[in-house]
């Protein structure tokens, strides 16, 4: 059975509607468009089977497949919605308002049982940041940060606090994904000269510092972002300060830390100074990508030892996105950058395509691991709103533009559980599309009339660094040199360079004399398919045909050939046909 086509939910001033994913791209006839202009929030369940939205009057829950209305709640002011991982609970949040007499206002965070429609619990949650309770994937545990301590509830029983994690002032926490046992990463900011720290615990072992799985302390941290990998074996911590005391940046200072559940921790050494724009785990949980440094930014893949594996060089980028299967990586520059994207094959570290999505404010992978949506949404940009659906090879398959008097606020793919979509082999040739190429023409710099017939001089502020493989080559036993050895090496480098230059001059003269005697028959341009496997086959076929040509020359000169050599000559026509077929497929 073929996997389903994911839906794309679109929310804007035109209302709320759903679009069928590739290959049809038509509006879904199953989900009835909500034409209200006041749709404030939408949410899919984790498996994509349920969909909830608030239209300014009610919060509705429907079954995505049948579009049958399951529940409806009279909550006109709700601005945030989220389902629990197993679809048992719908969490809703609306802005908190105190009572007129100055006493505490009504609870603004509600947890509803999706099956019965009953409100299980209401809380007062003043801040919108981190408003939603966190669940373990099996919903055995639910946690909230209340007055600088973490409260844990078990089996969705919100009337009894099963456990508390109390430290000096817990500012933030993140539950690990995946199966039991659940782990918790907590952040406590520094105070009175004491450093900030992040600790990892295994639920419910919170009894003192010795019970922590790992601990990492640091001084430069006003706020942190904690990122678990999919297997819950390690956390990446981006520590940020609001002010950079060195004066190098207006936007503070960032450092990247690695903490593993086995107690190991390290600072990830980033080769270029500057801000950290984005850090993302590969879904395989054994490597991560960081985008960092003053523009043009560097992007590097690191392993679990925090050693660089591959450096993508520098470029106009500030974001990284792994595909759901982890086999493709997109590096992109959105926001104040032009929207240039680089699509990389992660296995071979080979560039697949370089599309440009100008003025994009949103990017997301489709759950099938083949398609991408980029969108220009309000209020970030209020003009040219719309979205495009791409194939990762660079082809635009669908383009939707909002009328000039309307706005689009949000687009969201229907999620699916892991394993629904199989991994497909990476393609390098652009898939066919009925839409024209989206590549903009490069803008020409103005040249005054006096300079128009003269050669152009380079006016680059900097040279972009090329990508390079950082893995140590197999067979090389080179060890890192000590400071003394490096100093001696620098001393001898000028002499060594002079010798090599002299040798090069001699060899150049001899090469020129031999080249004048032996002119090549024909210069054949090297054609590549873009697919490493096909290129390898073509190379091997040409090698075999060259050997057959040599055997034919030997036979013409009167040499007696062996039986196996004659058999090789007989295969020439078949090899030529195979080569022609491969080259036609380029």
Swiss-Prot record:
Q: Which GO terms describe its biological process?
A: regulation of translation; ribosome assembly
Q: Which InterPro entries match?
A: TIF2A, TIF_beta_prop-like, WD40/YVTN_repeat-like_dom_sf, WD40_repeat_dom_sf
Q: Which residues form a coiled coil?
A: 532-583
Query: Gene3D superfamilies in the record, alphabetically?
Result: YVTN repeat-like/Quinoprotein amine dehydrogenase
Q: Which GO terms describe its cellular component?
A: cytoplasm; cytosolic small ribosomal subunit; eukaryotic translation initiation factor 2 complex
Q: Does the keyword 4Fe-4S apply?
A: no
Query: Which ranges does the UniProt record give for the WD repeats?
Result: 23-63, 125-163, 356-401
* Record Pfam families: eIF2A
Biased composition annotated in UniProt, kind: Polar residues: 470-479, 507-521
Which residue stretches belong to region Disordered? 434-531
Tell me the SUPFAM superfamilies matching this sequence: WD40 repeat-like
Q: Where is the composition biased (Basic and acidic residues)?
A: 495-506
Q: Which GO terms describe its molecular function?
A: mRNA binding; ribosome binding; translation initiation factor activity; tRNA binding
Listed A to Z, the keywords are: Coiled coil, Initiation factor, Protein biosynthesis, Repeat, Translation regulation, WD repeat
Keyword Coiled coil in record: yes
What's the stated role of this polypeptide? Functions in the early steps of protein synthesis of a small number of specific mRNAs. Acts by directing the binding of methionyl-tRNAi to 40S ribosomal subunits. In contrast to the eIF-2 complex, it binds methionyl-tRNAi to 40S subunits in a codon-dependent manner, whereas the eIF-2 complex binds methionyl-tRNAi to 40S subunits in a GTP-dependent manner.
Which family, according to the similarity comment? Belongs to the WD repeat EIF2A family.
Query: Any idea what this protein is called?
Result: Eukaryotic translation initiation factor 2A
Protein source organism: Gallus gallus (Chicken)
List the lineage, top down. Answer: Eukaryota, Metazoa, Chordata, Craniata, Vertebrata
Q: Which gene encodes it?
A: EIF2A
């Amino acid at each position: 059975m073929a996997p389903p086509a994911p839906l794309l939910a679109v929310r804007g001033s035109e209302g709320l509607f759903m679009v069928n994913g590739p290959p049809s791209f038509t509006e879904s006839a199953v989900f009835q468009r909500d034409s209200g202009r006041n749709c404030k929030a939408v949410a899919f369940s984790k498996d994509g089977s349920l969909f909830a939205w608030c239209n300014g009057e009610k919060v509705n829950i429907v079954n995505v497949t049948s579009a049958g209305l399951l529940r409806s709640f009279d909550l006109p002011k709700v601005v945030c919605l989220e389902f629990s991982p197993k679809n048992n609970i719908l969490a809703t949040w609306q802005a908190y308002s105190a009572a007129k007499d100055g006493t505490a206002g009504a609870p603004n965070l509600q947890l509803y049982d999706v099956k019965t429609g009953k409100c299980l619990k209401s809380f007062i949650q003043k801040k919108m940041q981190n408003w939603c309770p966190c669940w373990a994937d099996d919903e055995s545990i639910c946690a909230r940060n209340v007055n600088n301590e973490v409260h844990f509830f078990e089996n969705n029983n919100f009337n009894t606090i099963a456990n508390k994690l109390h430290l000096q002032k817990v500012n933030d926490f993140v539950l690990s994904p995946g199966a039991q046992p659940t782990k918790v990463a907590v952040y406590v900011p520094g105070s009175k000269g004491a450093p900030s720290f992040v600790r990892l615990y295994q639920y419910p072992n919170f009894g003192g510092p010795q019970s922590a799985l790992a601990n990492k302390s640091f001084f430069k941290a006003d706020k942190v972002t904690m990122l678990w990998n999919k297997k819950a074996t390690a956390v990446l911590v981006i520590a940020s300060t609001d002010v950079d005391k060195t004066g190098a940046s207006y936007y503070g200072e960032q450092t990247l830390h690695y903490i593993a559940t086995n107690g190991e921790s390290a600072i990830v050494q980033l080769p270029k100074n500057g801000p950290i724009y984005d850090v993302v785990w590969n879904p395989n949980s054994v490597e991560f990508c960081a985008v960092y440094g003053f523009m043009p930014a560097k992007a590097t893949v690191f392993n679990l030892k925090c050693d660089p594996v591959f450096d993508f060089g520098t470029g106009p980028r500030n974001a990284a996105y792994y595909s759901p299967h982890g086999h493709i990586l997109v590096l992109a520059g959105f926001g104040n950058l032009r929207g240039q994207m680089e699509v990389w094959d992660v296995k071979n570290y080979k560039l697949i395509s370089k599309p440009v999505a100008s003025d994009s404010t949103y990017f997301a992978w489709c759950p099938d691991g083949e398609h991408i949506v980029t969108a220009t949404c309000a209020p970030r940009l209020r003009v040219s709103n719309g979205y495009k659906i791409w194939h990762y090879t660079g082809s635009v398959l669908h383009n939707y533009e909002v009328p000039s008097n309307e706005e689009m606020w949000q687009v969201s793919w229907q999620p699916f559980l892991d394993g629904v979509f199989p991994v497909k082999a990476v393609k390098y040739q652009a898939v066919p599309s009925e839409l024209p190429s989206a590549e903009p023409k490069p803008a020409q710099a103005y040249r005054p009339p006096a300079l128009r017939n003269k050669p152009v001089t380079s006016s680059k502020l900097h040279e972009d660094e090329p990508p390079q493989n950082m893995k140590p080559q197999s067979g090389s036993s080179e060890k890192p040199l000590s400071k003394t050895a490096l100093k001696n090496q620098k001393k001898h480098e000028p002499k060594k360079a002079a010798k090599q230059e002299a040798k090069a001059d001699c060899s150049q003269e001899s090469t020129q004399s031999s080249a004048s005697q032996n002119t090549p028959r024909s210069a054949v341009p090297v054609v590549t398919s873009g697919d490493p496997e096909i290129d390898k086959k073509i190379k091997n076929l040409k090698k075999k045909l060259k050997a057959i040509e040599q055997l034919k020359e030997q036979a013409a000169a009167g040499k007696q050939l062996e039986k196996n050599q004659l058999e090789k000559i007989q295969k020439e026509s078949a090899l030529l046909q195979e080569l022609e077929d491969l080259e036609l497929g380029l």
